[in-house]
Structures are given as C-alpha cells and as structure tokens.
Amino acid sequence: MDIKNKNLTELNELCKQIRERILEVVSQNGGHLSSNMGAVELIVAMHYVFDPDSDPFIFDVSHQSYAHKLLTGRWDEFSSLRQLGGISGYTKPKESKFDYFVAGHSSTSISLAVGAAKAIKLKGENRIPVALIGDGAMSAGMAYEAMNELGERKYPCIIILNDNEMSISRPIGAISKYLSQMMAGEFYQKFKGRVNQLLSYIPDGAAYMAKRFEEGFRLITPGMLFEELGLEYIGPVNGHDLADLISAFKVAKSMKKPVIVHTQTIKGKGYEKAEGFDEHWHGVGPFDLQSGEPKKHAKRSATQIYSEALLNLAAKHKNVVGVTAAMPTGTGMDKLIEAFPERFWDVAIAEQHAVTSMAAMAKEGFKPYITIYSTFMQRAYDQVIHDLAIMNLSAVIAMDRAGIVGEDGETHEGCFDISFLNAIPNVSMCAPRDEQSFKDMIEYSYVHEGLLAIRYPRGSFILHEQFKDAPKISRGKSVLLRENKNAKTALIGYGNGVGRAYEVSIKLDFETDLIDLVFAKPLDKEFLINLAKKDKIWYIFSDSVKKGGIGDILSAFLQENKIYDVEINTFEYDDKFLPHGKTPDVEYFLGLDIDSLAKKILNDKKY
C-alpha cells in the first residue's frame, strides 16, 4: 500500500482502519493484541518516511508487526492470522518480501540492523536499516552488545524504541519535557551539529568547560545512556502523534548516523479494555469484542498445576527459590512472586543471567526452580552446561510450553529440549503425564540431587484421572500403566505423549502394553531390558524432534545393551520446522492425530 501521498488526515483515518482490522481478526483468531494496537502510528510513520521496498524493516520479536503486514498487501489474507496455512503472527520472509527476517525471540533486531548496515556499506548502496524494538526487549544484554558496536562503527541506522510502559525513563518535570521536545526538532539537531563544529575553534579551557556543560545537560535528559554508547538520541516522542513521528523520523534519516528515536506509546491504544499495563491483553485467545471476555474457558492447564504445586512446596521449605525471565504470568510464577517476593524473581529478558544467578543460589544451599519456556531455554544453553552441570548443582529447570505450541509457530515450538539437554552430563530429565504425576514430580524434585529438567505442555494434559493410582515418582523409574499379557507390542509415552499413547491404545482395543517412560535420563535399565524380552515392537509417543529425541535415546539404549531384536517406531517430529496453527490442526497436518496414529499401527499388521 502506497501511503506517501496521503495527508495527515488521511493517515490518521488509515490508523483507525488498521486498528479496527486488528481488533476484528484478533478477537476471532487470538493473537498479540495490546502491542499491535499501540504500535499502529509508529508503523504507519515508518512506511511514510522510509522505503519498505529497499530499507530493511526489522521488527524485534515481531509480535507488533500486524500493521506492517496490513500495509504490505496482506489486508484480505489477514483474516487467516495464526491459522494453519495462513498469515503468521510474526514476520516471515517466506510470506512476504517486506518481512526482512524471521523473528519471535527477543532482542535480535539491533544486531540484525548492524549486520544489514555493514552489508549495505560494503555494497555501496543508499539504504538504511530501520529496527523497531520495545522497551522490554531492551532489558536483554544482546541489545546492548549490538548498540556497543554500532556506537563505535557509526553505521547509518535507525533504532525506533517503542517504550510502551515507560520503564526506561520518564520525563522529569517541565524542564525535561521541554528539552525532549526541543531534541526532537530539526532545528535542535542542526544547532547541535553547528555548536560542535564551533567548539573545535574555542581555546582548550573553554572547550573543556563547554564539554562539561554538555555532559551536565545530558544528565537530565532521557538520552544520556544512548549518547554515552555513541548513538544520537531523539525523543521522547509521542508515539501516537503522526506529525511528531514523521518529523522525528525525517530528522533521524537525514543524520546519516546511528540514531535512537525514543517513542512513548500506550499498549492496547484504541481498545479501552486493553489500554494500559494489563498483561492479560498481550497475547489473547478469541474474545468477545463488546465484553472483552474470552470465547472459550480453557481447561486446567499444566502451568496452573505447576504454579500451585510450587507454591505449596515453597510454603513448606524456606530454601525454595525461583526465577523466570519476563514471563511471570505465562509461567505461573506471578503467584510465587506475589506470595514470596523475597525468594522469587522476574529478571526480565535475561535467560542467561537467570540460570547463572540461580547456580550461585544452589551453591549457597538453596533449591532453585528456573521456570522458562522450552523455546527460551535455548538461549541459556551455555549457562546450563558451564554454571549448573559442570558444578553438579541441585536445581530444577521447569520448561513450560514443551512440544507443539500452536499458533505461535516455528520460533516458539518447544521440541528441542530433550535433544540438547540429553547430551549434557549430570542432567536428569523427566516429564509428567497428568496432573497427579506432575504434583508428585514437583514433590520429588525437591529431594532430587543434581540438576533435574522437567518439561510440560502448553494448555492441559490429555490424561486426567485414568491412572491416579499409579506408583509415585521415583528416580529413573518407568511405570507400566496397562499390561496385556498376550501382547508383543508396547506403546511407550513420554510426558503428554502418554496421553496420546493411551488414546491410541483404546483404538487398538488395549491389545498392547502401555508404558510411561517418566524419565528420559536416567533410563530405567532393568525395566526396559525386561520389556524387550516380552515386547518386540515399540511405538514411541513424545512431543519432541526425532533427532536426539526419545526414539533415538531408546534405540541407543538397546544398542548399548546388545538388544537387536526389538523394532522401534517413533511418532516424533521430522527434521523440519513446524508450521503455525491450532495444535489439533498441526497434529493432523503432521499425521500425529489419534486416528492417524492408530491407523499407522493397524496398517503395520505387526502388533
């Protein structure tokens, strides 16, 4: 959509239409609402001042990119947002040439902008990278690593800081407000450059005094940090005033330097129920536009079970501590932080720091619970090895959102943790099958010596109370949930895969043995060797990738124990990234729904 010839009135009307479209679709499909509603004017101004055909538009995390999608030819397709085969909720180059880079994890945008700026310079092109990053993403060290180099190299680059919670800086009284407005003006930027030129002609003493005055001046302005890093600073700018935004972006573009444009916006702008700081409206399911109430009431989730179980554990043991990285509500850790603020912390987007700080607490005799989404644990892999495993410390890594996460898609799938953690010495891995086993697992985790990784799904467990009388958790022990003495086939489940195996066994009239592996590491050697003597065909059910997954782990076990007469078939994910869409739709697409799985086993005619 070409908007460069529109006047201000027309642009404001366009912003209104974009908000209406976002509300219409997100209320039907779910998605990231408040961040997108708050960024509409920013993105319209970006498209007005810069050239989306040539300038790389880089969205940090990119869950604020809906307006960008609507402005780049996806208005009609937008109704398929986050559906299987439809528009992604994040930027995706395969979807549109206007999506410069895949995004979904935080704080990558400035590094990408630096790399793009280097490439543009080497190619001798007249383009400029434009990165849009939120104040939350600015809490991660990677953003500062990138700004540190950018300030040194001075590549032309625009960083738009979307400060939608005012957590970085607030205007300090009338003086600061005046200075901020002045700094956003073209006159000030030209004046500042001219003054710097004139200062070079002043005698050394006077120049030194002028320099000290300038430093003092910056101490009472919000841009001090960024200017100390070597970046030019414009702002704060009202992120909902198109005239101010366009003016500030034009000034930034003309400077041919690395520039931070600090904008302040309101999350949820334009939808009264979402305006402000309510985290509930960040990511939402389908909801009623009039009431704001969700259209479906979710079943009791694994996250709720974990939160309540850990709350009970922390009430009993004063050495239980915990941390999450910018996901207190999503992980259920908000309840712990509220109940025990001196023992549970949200450290913002800082997974590496979260792990290492808890390692020191484990060393001091505390029992840390590091509660992070499976996909984000990838960001702290080195710290798990270097600071927890090598030290052989007793801590718990609780990984929420393991397996298919549905609509968020490939950047958020929690399917790699088994593979990357299994390779690390001194790590034990287990997964609950249902609510009762999860509660037992949390109780067990407190007495477990060493590093224990627990994975659990987004949403609810497939199983409920079918096996409430099963044995309690014991280190490295698997459980035979249902035995068929005549069977030669075993369905082996891990985590939520046990529920899938159980439902398949119903389709097969229970003519198989049903096993809950419980521990992927250490394995229950005696149990598995005895199982191999009876059952010669094993079907594996796990929400994980095949490479390095449960099937590979069990195949390696059989090889190591010289057991060559057992056939393993694994229902895990192939070596490709998973599509976004509702979880049942994705499972059906992959052939991992219950009917398809049962049919595959029946067609084998071996069981």
UniProtKB/Swiss-Prot annotation:
Alphabetical keyword list: Isoprene biosynthesis, Magnesium, Metal-binding, Thiamine biosynthesis, Thiamine pyrophosphate, Transferase
One of the GO biological process terms: thiamine biosynthetic process
UniProt catalytic activity: D-glyceraldehyde 3-phosphate + pyruvate + H(+) = 1-deoxy-D-xylulose 5-phosphate + CO2
Enzyme class, UniProt record, top EC level: transferase
List of residues binding thiamine diphosphate: H63, G104, H105, S106, G136, A137, N164, Y271, E351
Example of a GO MF term: magnesium ion binding
Family annotation (InterPro entries): Dxylulose-5-P_synthase, THDP-binding, Transketo_C/PFOR_II, Transketolase-like_Pyr-bd, Transketolase_BS, Transketolase_C, Transketolase_CS
CDD domains for the chain: TPP_DXS (cd02007), TPP_PYR_DXS_TK_like (cd07033)
Gene Ontology CC entries for this record: cytosol
Cofactor: binding details: Binds 1 Mg(2+) ion per subunit.
Binding residues annotated for Mg(2+), in chain numbering: D135, N164
Cofactor dependence: Mg(2+); thiamine diphosphate
Biochemical pathway: Metabolic intermediate biosynthesis; 1-deoxy-D-xylulose 5-phosphate biosynthesis; 1-deoxy-D-xylulose 5-phosphate from D-glyceraldehyde 3-phosphate and pyruvate: step 1/1
Pfam families named in the record: DXP_synthase_N, Transket_pyr, Transketolase_C
Signal peptide location: none
EC number of this enzyme: 2.2.1.7
PANTHER family according to UniProt: 1-D-DEOXYXYLULOSE 5-PHOSPHATE SYNTHASE-RELATED, 1-DEOXY-D-XYLULOSE-5-PHOSPHATE SYNTHASE, CHLOROPLASTIC
Family listed: Belongs to the transketolase family. DXPS subfamily.
Described function: Catalyzes the acyloin condensation reaction between C atoms 2 and 3 of pyruvate and glyceraldehyde 3-phosphate to yield 1-deoxy-D-xylulose-5-phosphate (DXP).
Assembly description: Homodimer.
Protein's recorded name: 1-deoxy-D-xylulose-5-phosphate synthase
Organism encoding this protein: Campylobacter hominis (strain ATCC BAA-381 / DSM 21671 / CCUG 45161 / LMG 19568 / NCTC 13146 / CH001A)
